Amino acid sequence: MIRAFVLYEGDVDPDRYAEHVVLCRAVPAAAFRHGRVFGAPMGEPKHRYYAEFEWPDLDAFKAAARGPEFAETGRDAMAMGVPFSVEFAELSD
């Protein structure tokens, strides 16, 4: 399983993010989830919002990553104006 996770440094506007979700759900073969970061083990959390894409395998991820839908989600995320980072992980049992 492959997961792309997005960590936003600030709060996102809920109405604007709802528009972003429509683009994210159009990425082929991916599950998409998102939500507010509400805490950390010690102190305040470094991030305020979290989103993730999930693909069943590396081939599905590679195919989606080459597509225009995935690229559009990145452009749209940048247009929201909230600093964020993206990382990719390969998960195993």
PLM ranges: what are they?
Residues 24-28, 70-75, 81:
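A common structural junction motif
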Residues 1-66, 87-93:
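Short S/T/G/P-rich N-terminal loop/turn motif that feeds into the first structured element of a domain
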